[in-house]
């Protein structure tokens, strides 16, 4: 395969797990057999499986808009997001400068943290300990994620009252 200038210049900077993903991932179960046959660390297996699930699952493809990239960043971390974007760059015939810019943008970012904890719900809002705290915390987290990682006390109270 012919590489564009970006991929040529950055090919030697790839780590082992990502390089393996470029070699073994496709629509077959080759990666599963590879994991069975060769001793690959669980961390590297997880990274390769993330890329495979993202690109080769039956789900409709996810667009690389800002909100979706932030969600990937939150759920899979910086390394997972960079792997997903790099895989797209290295397997495409043309270089998408937007993807390179996104990698550079997220390199210096920290994963967002939800400021509300279960202890806060129990202490400040009088919710009894138990399963309900987890359910409400999950609802708050979903609203927080869909609202670009911002949530007001008003929204929290509204969720807790429902």
Where are these regions (language model features)?
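Conserved, hydrophobic alpha-helical core segments of structured domains
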Residues: 1-92
């Amino acid at each position: 395969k012919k590489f564009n200038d970006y991929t040529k210049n950055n090919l030697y900077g790839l780590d082992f797990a990502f390089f393996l993903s470029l070699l073994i991932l496709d629509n077959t179960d080759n990666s599963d057999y590879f994991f069975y046959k060769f001793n690959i660390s669980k961390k590297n297996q997880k990274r390769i499986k993330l890329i495979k699930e993202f690109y080769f699952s039956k789900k409709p493809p996810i667009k690389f808009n800002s909100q979706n990239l932030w969600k990937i960043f939150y759920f899979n971390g910086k390394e997972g997001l960079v792997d997903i974007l790099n895989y797209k760059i290295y397997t495409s015939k043309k270089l998408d400068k937007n993807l390179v810019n996104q990698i550079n943008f997220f390199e210096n970012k920290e994963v967002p943290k939800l400021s509300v904890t279960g202890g806060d719900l129990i202490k400040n809002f009088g919710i009894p300990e138990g399963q309900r705290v987890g359910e409400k915390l999950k609802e708050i987290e979903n609203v927080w994620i869909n609202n670009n990682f911002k949530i007001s006390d008003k929204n929290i109270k509204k969720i807790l009252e429902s």
